[in-house]
């Protein structure tokens, strides 16, 4: 990498954007494509979200002493985009407690004594009944579904926002023109590694050069 620095960097607006989130266009499109393929209702897909987001590189492509990347396009992420990414990350942490316990949502089984009659005798049977609101399992399931709806809504809204986001891509030329920056390379010092010249003498003890 050629050493140098941007002249006038402190007075430019670029100085305030060094610590902002930037994305390389190709990397952004790939991560967004993978997010669009995920089905939030599936726990296996929710578990993939952190890994997908971790592949998104949001480092700045420039500093005062690092020239804007050449041959690539980058875009600055606005505040709302960063919030949407954080919402997707938070939603991915959702897990249904009922699912983790291998429970069946909304159904409880119990053994009940069927009434006897003159035609059918007394027998033991398993009856599936709708849960009552007083059932602790039902209350837990309602609470779990409520959180799932919130998490699912947050995920889909945030993902749709990112998909519809129109990023402004900049390459090196665009960036330097926009912020009126000039890159100045650091001069390379040429070191003299040659030693002093020693007069040569002829073999056999003859007179050296310059001797009359």
Curated annotation (Swiss-Prot):
Record keywords, A-Z: Capsid protein, Virion
Signal sequence segment: none
Keyword Protein transport among record annotations: no
Cellular compartment(s): Virion
Biased composition, class Polar residues, residue ranges: 109-126, 186-202
Mitochondrion among keywords: no
Pfam families (alphabetical): TMV_coat (PF00721)
Chain spans, region Disordered: 109-128, 185-212
Main location: virion
Single GO cellular component term: viral capsid
GO molecular function, one term: structural molecule activity
InterPro entries: TMV-like_coat, TMV-like_coat_sf
Feature: compositional bias, Gly residues: 203-212
Protein known as: Coat protein
Organism of provenance: Pea early browning virus
